[in-house]
Structures are given as structure tokens and as C-alpha cells.
Amino acid sequence: MPHNMKPHFTALGAAYQLHYYLWFKTHYLEPLLASAERQQLAKEVILDTCNRHDYSLLESDFDSTHLRLLISLQPKHSVSHAVKLLKGNLEYQFRKAFDSEKLLGRGYFARTAGRVDLDRARNYVANQITHYGYQGEWTKPLEFRNSAFRSPAFSFAHYSTILNYHLVFATQERIPIFDEVIGPKLFDYVIAVGKKHQFAVDRISLLPDHMHMIIEGTPSVSVEEYVLAIMNNTQHWMTKRYDGVLKQTGAWDVWQPSYYAGTVGEFTSAQVAKFFAKK
């Protein structure tokens, strides 16, 4: 979308479940969390930080050298900002309580988890077209599997992340506006949007009245920012390229001002929680 264009969508409704597994390590893997007292303080600081910033701590596990968390975030939250607040508050409170110079190492690991694992989510997206009863050769251009996609899609110097999201968008008033002609061109455009806004497309299923996507993102960008980038850019693109379709259907907004976003990963949230319980 050109820089001088006013965004069509600014505030959106959302249904979401965004779960993240975070793993921090102590400075030089020194046993700085060996005592029950230090582990208790760490848990209190993490709980307080989560409460103050509208995060939900679902599970936690500590040993002498590592902190492992399963947290739930809102679409407006970015992983990198949540990590910055959690680590910053831990450092501050431990410095106050124990006169410690440094508690945590520089990096972190972050991985998404969800109701279902990534493979099941991919299959779910791939089966949407037949699920809704669409059949025949004309439906093949409505499904896109990115042969160039590799995960991890992004690499960073001091931390490692694999952040996979399942996104669903419905057209304005569920009006059918997409077809096999628009589909392939729309997929190419969404890939271009991803390159600009730091997400990689894994796969897309496009139905006449809604779209499913699986993408991999970066920790510095929130789900809400990804969604706004996709919705605003594709709305502008449809207006520019297919104004005849929008005029005929009356769907000038293209999308409803709402969406679904769910995290998916190698393991489900329940599997991660079960792992914590066994520690």
C-alpha cells in the first residue's frame, strides 16, 4: 500500500488464542536460580509483570540455569516487547534483592503453541476448499502451498524464534468475491506484502467468501500489525485491480473488520503444559 494512502482498517475485532513457549537461560549458565528463594522471587516477578501488562502466565518451570514459560498474549502484544519486559523486570528485582550484577543471558528461545499442532493446522487449511463442497479443476488455483517456504524463516544473531500463525479473514458480509482468476495473483501479492512486513507465507486457501493463511512471523511484529498489513494492502489491491468485481458485489471494504488468529507449533499448548507438569 502506498505510504500516502490512508489505511482502510484501523481497529478490528478479533477471536484469538496466542500461546508462546519462552525459554531464558542464566548468565553464562551459572546456577543463579539454584535456591528455592530465588526461584520463588522469579515466579513472583513474572506473575507481577504478566498481570501489569495483560499477559497470562499459563505454566512455568525453573531450574538452576533455565526459566521456561508458557504465556498467552493478546494480538496487540509482540513477543520481543514481552520478553524485554519480563527479562528487564527480573534483572531489576534480582539486582535489588541479591545485589546480583546480571541474572540472565543475552538471548532467548520463543516458539508458538496452540490447540492443534502445525501439521494438523496445515492439513486443515489445505482441506478447506473440499470441506465447503467446492470441487473440480477450477478450485486448484484457490490453494497455494509455498514451495520456497523454509522454517525457521528468519534468523537472528542473539535469539531463536519459530512463530507460526493461522489467520482467517472473512469477506464483507460474507459476499463471494474471490475466484480462480483472482486467487493466484492475490497469493503473489500477499507474498510481496510479507516481504515488506516481515512475515513468510507457508500456505493459503482462498474461498469465495473467506481466506485461511498460515504464516511465520518475527518477534518484533504483533499479530495485530500483521493482520492490519494484510487486510489494508489486499483491500487497496482489490480496489485497484478488481474494482469491477467490487462494484458488482458492493463489497468495497473487501473484508469484515474482524479476524481469527491462532498460534500453532510443533507441539500443542496441552503438550507443553504436560511437559512442565512432569518436571
Where are these regions (language model features)?
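Charge-rich, low-complexity N-terminal segments
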Residues: 2-279
